[in-house]
């Protein structure tokens, strides 16, 4: 199984679990991305819970939406085992074409330091990446404890793969899984197609 994205038994079980989760969600869940989902929760009363999506701390800040959202750890299996998420996000880099490298390096050092992350960066609406900001009492007070409540999920996550070809696979396999969740393909067909895409 060296050229498969996942073994058959594990893959079929994962697809079955996704299907079970989606069957308990409102019908619009397959049309929304996480931001649209948080907008729905923060802006109305038709949905009260999202069990599994990437977090955006601005929805946990007073005044951002009609409803202040509270974030927590990921859902658990019936046996109590926690699910794990991928850790991705935006980064900060310096282009090889940069003509002011030293200034760019100093800016990156400044914006990524703990003090900036827990003050200016957060105050400006940013979602900090520095652990000290996630543990900061004032940052958590002003974000309805978003960071403290989700830190364990971050600690238990796995880093999104960065190898050449992975993003193409992710972009291509997503619609395949989506079709399965809309009952347009069997789990077996879905797994075969995902493995085909993984070999490309």
Residue ranges, per PLM feature:
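Short helix-initiation/N-cap motifs at beta->coil->alpha
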Residues: 28-42
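Non-transmembrane alpha-helical segments in soluble domains
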Residues: 12-23, 38, 42, 95, ...
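Acidic/polar loop patches that form or flank catalytic/metal-binding clefts of enzymes
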Residues: 24-31, 49-50, 68-70, 118-121
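Glycine-centered hinge/linker elements that transmit conformational signals in sensory
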Residues: 2-32, 74
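Alpha-to-beta junction loops
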Residues: 43-53
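Extracytoplasmic/periplasmic substrate-recognition and gating elements
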Residues: 62-124, 175-178, 182
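Extracytoplasmic/periplasmic solute-binding protein
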Residues: 1-4, 45-47
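Long, aromatic- and glycine/proline-rich binding clefts that accommodate carbohydrate-like moieties
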Residues: 122-172, 179
